[in-house]
Amino acid sequence: MGLFDRFTRRGGARPRAGVDSDARHLADWAASHRGVEAYIEPETTVTELTVVLVAYDGEWTRRKVGGERGARKLGQDLKIPVYDVRKTGYPQRMRDYDNRRRIERKRERQREL
């Protein structure tokens, strides 16, 4: 045992269970919403590459999908368009949905007082 052995990674590829359950969640979510589009978010220093599904009303969900290839395959499997956020940006309806939810939460808090 070397001095730095405890810092080396052991084992094979990362477990697929998380990616599979994320893909299943995205497929279920897309099936239960109308007008769904996928937006690929780039990897950052904090997060892995993710895909955001946005419905016609702006409701959205985000999950990891196993890289850009996985995101594109998900789009093909679900028969939905796939966009790159770095090129297109987020859709306005997504921002509008977040703003509506923020206002609703604020009103709810005020009613509770």
Task: For the regions a language model picked out, list residue spans one by one.
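Intrinsic disorder
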Residues: 1-113
